[in-house]
Amino acid sequence: MRYLIAILSLLSLANAQFGGFFDQMFGQQGGHEQHHGQPQNNPSDASHYRHQYDNSVCDKYLCPDTLACVHFPHHCPCAWDAQQEKFELAEGQRMCVSRGGFREGETARKLELARKGLL
């Protein structure tokens, strides 16, 4: 009887420890897929983006990368404004550049050097 209890305890411990691992690795149990209400991944094509773009309401300019509604294209915000700096270019466009841990103004200086062909 003690052996039976010990074996059952070990099996339940192993299931608790590795059960999720095996379910994730093999994705099936008993030949049937299990769905526990987990969210589905976005599709691998552009249909999700097109749906968001098509359903956006904007009477001015709709920024293609952030779907923000602004007056002019160069007013579009950067998608990751905490990590990127926005630079407005002379042609009425804008560019988002990673801050990269540089000193204040260093990114702008490097962008200007690149624009002049010196970098």
From Swiss-Prot:
Region described as Disordered: spans on this chain: 29-48
Leader sequence segment: 1-16
Keywords annotated in UniProt: Signal
GO-annotated biological processes: ERAD pathway
Domain of life: Eukaryota
Function: Probable component of the endoplasmic reticulum-associated degradation (ERAD) pathway.
Protein family per UniProt: Belongs to the LCL2 family.
This protein's name: Long chronological lifespan protein 2
Name of the encoding gene: LCL2
